Amino acid sequence: MKRTYQPNNRKRAKTHGFRARMKTKSGRNILARRRAKGRHQLTVSDE
């Protein structure tokens, strides 16, 4: 049986990347929350 997690960097960035987060209001909320919390890495793009 094929597992559910099939790693793919392009898909990862397009779904969870910084520009993807900036596109929606809720995505911008996520970034604001992570900034407020002091996360070193805001999105997967920051690796």
From Swiss-Prot:
Q: Any coiled-coil ranges, and where?
A: none
| PROSITE patterns, alphabetized | RIBOSOMAL_L34
- What are the protein's UniProt keywords? Ribonucleoprotein, Ribosomal protein, RNA-binding, rRNA-binding
Question: Among the entry's GO cellular component annotations, what is one?
Answer: ribonucleoprotein complex
Q: Which GO terms describe its biological process?
A: translation
| Molecular function GO terms recorded | rRNA binding; structural constituent of ribosome
Q: Does the keyword Ribonucleoprotein apply?
A: yes
Checking InterPro entries in the record gives: Ribosomal_bL34, Ribosomal_bL34_CS
Q: State the superkingdom.
A: Bacteria
What does the protein in this record do?
Binds the 23S rRNA.
The family note in this entry says: Belongs to the bacterial ribosomal protein bL34 family.
* Assembly mode: Part of the 50S ribosomal subunit. Contacts protein L4.
Q: Mind telling me what this protein is named?
A: Large ribosomal subunit protein bL34
Query: From which source organism is this entry?
Result: Deinococcus radiodurans (strain ATCC 13939 / DSM 20539 / JCM 16871 / CCUG 27074 / LMG 4051 / NBRC 15346 / NCIMB 9279 / VKM B-1422 / R1)
Chain's gene name: rpmH
